[in-house]
Amino acid sequence: MKWKRILFNERAELGSNTLLDIAIAIVDHDLSFRKQGLMFGNIGTSLFLFQMGKWKVDNHIQMEGLEMLTSLIRRTNTELETMRNFNMLDVSFDTGISGIGWGINYLLQNKFIDSEFSGIFTLTDAIILRRMITVVQEPELDKLYQAIGIGLYAISQDSRLSKEYLRRFIKELFNRVKENDTSKKIVRQSFNTIIGLIRLLEKINVKFPDINHTKELILWFYRVFARFPMSSSTFNLQILYTLLNCYESMSWVEGELNQRAKYIIQNLYIISRPCL
């Protein structure tokens, strides 16, 4: 993805100073009581501090990010050591261990932290990744959304274990969508779950193109998406614009489906334009 600058001159300086004020406010508050995940937890906040410290060349902010990271790892490991029922483990991307693992991998890959942090959750990786399979095997698919965050965590790893679990996930999901009763249950999933699964499958296809049936699943979920009742909210409109880019970049997607996606977006744009 190529980033384009959207703020210039005074507005750019104002935006920069505002972000710095946010970082300073975070440093001045005790956030240990919060969840530890990526979207709504301390690993996401830690990433923000690392990025701000690098951008502003502020070692103090970076050290605060490192301290927050060390604290949340210590707390998470303590919870894992005392946990008796791993079915109670929060494996979500937003607040749980999948988001923590993804965040640590991001910091490692971008050289914010040393290799001593690698393999932090090695002992629990199999438990986390297995959950990605079990949620697909559950009769009612009530927790299918959990597979998205775990899958993103698995993709962020460069291990044979994670690739094997992603392969099993694709195989299980492919087998289930072929069943009439199961496909109806998947179609009844939330809009965000369908969007999340499409994006996850696309990322799997890019990183591991040798995993069979991934493209078939992407196309199947695109069909589900095209039949989904759409709202004209700004949030959904933004998601639709993102998906249109995916449609246009994938020549193997059916032409009729592609045209329908464009039609939906054009009509939603007309309806929603005052909200933008």
Report residues per predicted region.
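Glycan-recognition and catalytic cores of secretory/periplasmic carbohydrate-active enzymes
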Residues: M1-L276
